[in-house]
Every structure is written in C-alpha cells, then in structure tokens.
Amino acid sequence: MDNDRYDILIAEIRKLNTALERLAGPAPIESDWTSADCFVWAPGRLYLQPVPKPNRVALTLIRGVDRVRDILHENTQRFAEGFPANNVLLWGARGMGKSSLVKAVHEDVRAASGVSLKLVEVHREDISTLPVLLDLVRDTPHRVIVFCDDLSFDHDDTAY
C-alpha cells in the first residue's frame, strides 16, 4: 500500500473513532465516595456530585411525625445493616419536612451505626436516568439511599 492510501485509511479510521466516541457519550467520571456522605446525581456527566455540607436538621428537632419517623428510621437501620428494606414514599404538602426527615434519618443512622451509608438525591427531571444511576452504584461497597425531592404527578404530565 502506498503512502497516500495509507494516509486516507488512517484519516477514515480517525473519523470513525470520533463518530463512535460521540455516539457512546461521556465516560462516567469516577465518583469519590469518601469525599462526602451525600451526593446529587448529575446524569449529563454520569457523576455523583459530592455535597460536603448538606443542609439538614437534627432528627430530634423534627416534631409531629413520630410514627412516620420511627418507621423510616427502622427501615433505614435495617437497610444499613444489610437486610432488605422497603422503598418509601413520603407524601404531603411542600414544606412539611419530608426531605428534612429523610436527611435527618440518614445522618442519625449513619452516625450511630458506623456503616458507610450514602444518600443520593435525584432531581425530578432526572428520574428517567435512574437505571443508569443504579448501574453505577450497584457495585459499590456502600449502602446507598436514592431519593427524589418534590416528586409530583400532574394531570397533564406524561413523563410518568
């Protein structure tokens, strides 16, 4: 093969490589699980963004939801210990403390158990990427709680 044909072949291979990389999308960025206990899912970069100082309140400050708090705490404790746990749906009006309760229970169980329990928040608009997120966290040695804040189902919403 002469040099001209060789150069043309190399150029075509490079074009193919560029097209394949574009189709494949971005490679996942390795998440540093040791950097935080709380993360936010960034699906565009296939990355768990650490939240080093999450906005949360102490569990003892949450009042008026004792039964729900106790059930959620027991379920989270079982999950942290490696036992099966139930999925949870907390519902109520905005501002009632649902997310605060989730974050407070996470911190209380994590601190008391010493288990590497991580909390990952998924934004409502990123729910469709849950399978990708679950693939990324499946092989981690950590116990991972995934939660979506302010999930709502509107009459005209066809995304669900």
What residue spans do the PLM features occupy?
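Phosphate-binding P-loop
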Residues: 51-53, 77-85
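Helical mechanochemical/support elements of P-loop NTPase systems and associated helical scaffolds
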Residues: 68-71, 101, 126-130, 156-159
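Walker A/P-loop nucleotide-binding motif
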Residues: 82-104
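Interdomain "pre-motor" coupling segment immediately N-terminal to P-loop NTPase/helicase cores
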Residues: 2-50
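Pre-Walker A adenine-sensing motif
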Residues: 67-81
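AAA+/P-loop NTPase substrate/partner-engagement loops
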Residues: 108-144, 151-156
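Dynamic helix-loop-helix/coil hinge segments at AAA+ ATPase domain boundaries and subdomain interfaces
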Residues: 7, 47-71
